[in-house]
Amino acid sequence: MSGLTTHILDQASGKPAAGVGVRVSRRDGEQTQWLAELRTDADGRARLVAGEDLAVGGYRLEFAIGDHFKASGLPVSDPPFLDVVVIDFAVSNLDQHWHVPLLVSPYGYSTYRGS
């Protein structure tokens, strides 16, 4: 089953990052097509693109993480060091599921190709 999903984990609290705004777009050369703008669920997860709407090519995820940390009550800089985390990646096989987790704190992040 193909498709594109994400899961955001707040490394500062050790909990899923619920309610984070995520935008997803497909990039084709100079053209950008916005596909979705949504928020993560209570478990920090979001289904971004259904399998039938996924295409081979470049994608961009934009995570509005600054708002999450401002609302968390953690001491963060103003403006936040990380406001929007942008991840550019490519889908190469439509027979696979594409999962892009984000592990994030107010001052750093990492990602990887999940399953």
Curated annotation (Swiss-Prot):
Gene3D superfamilies tied to this protein: Transthyretin/hydroxyisourate hydrolase domain
Top EC class for this record: hydrolase
EC nos: 3.5.2.17
Region Disordered, residue ranges: 1-23
Domain of life: Bacteria
Catalysis: reaction(s): 5-hydroxyisourate + H2O = 5-hydroxy-2-oxo-4-ureido-2,5-dihydro-1H-imidazole-5-carboxylate + H(+)
Miscellaneous comment: HIU hydrolysis also occurs spontaneously, but more slowly.
Name of the protein: 5-hydroxyisourate hydrolase
UniProt source species: Caulobacter vibrioides (strain ATCC 19089 / CIP 103742 / CB 15) (Caulobacter crescentus)
